[in-house]
Regions:
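Active-site-adjacent structural elements in enzyme catalytic cores
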Residues: 1-204
Length: 204
């Protein structure tokens, strides 16, 4: 199965892979046709930007314009794991990933196979494996049904927690939590007491 997954990614296809939150629909981020394929599969509006799934701090530095002092500590303390970090995008981030926004989100999923595929193929997009606007399937079989068996991937239901990732915005002078997930503000402060938080804005 792994060879089939790699072949699908290589040719610009999309595959279902587990993360620590939910299953994602992964494809090569720097391949415009592959990203377009994911948008069409998910029926996702084109103005909804995508995150870059990366494998290291070096990848984050390679695609971001600003690197605040707390970035390295956040990566060391919480990644790989359920944290999305938003930074200013540099000109290496293609417009088809971040919809021409000035920022881009970074994820580093902790599933070992998913992370290894990111290392092998470079940055991948990986939005939740569902039809846009519908609930995400909680099992691999449900996801296959959602996509009429037209996708392949790796089944590992036991790895998923179903909890959201926390989204933290480092693109401004103050740090904002845009969505509270399994990593809390208190968790972050315990590791990085000096982090310059702004007022918390929870997206429910």
């Amino acid at each position: 199965m792994m060879e089939k997954i790699k072949q699908e990614l290589e040719k610009g296809g999309a595959v279902v892979l587990p993360t620590e939150t939910v299953y994602g629909l992964f494809a090569k981020a720097l391949d415009e046709k592959a990203v377009d394929h994911v948008y069409r599969l998910k029926r996702r509006p084109r103005d909804k930007a995508l995150n870059l799934n990366v494998a290291s701090l070096g990848d984050i530095l390679n695609f971001s314009k600003n690197q605040p002092p707390c970035l390295q500590q956040l990566v060391k303390s919480f990644l790989p794991g359920p944290l999305t970090i938003i930074l200013e995008a540099n000109d290496k981030v293609p417009y088809w990933v971040n919809s021409d926004l000035t920022t881009v989100g970074f994820r580093m999923p902790s599933h070992p196979v998913t992370l290894e595929l990111i290392r092998e193929f470079g940055p991948l997009i990986g939005p939740s494996a569902n039809i846009s606007g519908q609930d995400s399937g909680v099992t691999y079989k449900e996801i296959l049904q959602d996509f009429n068996q037209n996708v392949l991937g790796l089944e590992d239901d036991a790895f998923l927690t179903g909890q959201d990732s926390t989204i933290i915005d480092l693109s401004g002078s103050k740090v904002k939590i845009l969505r509270q997930g399994s990593i809390t503000r208190e968790d972050i402060l315990a590791k990085i007491p000096e982090i310059p938080f702004e007022e918390v804005c929870y997206a429910m």
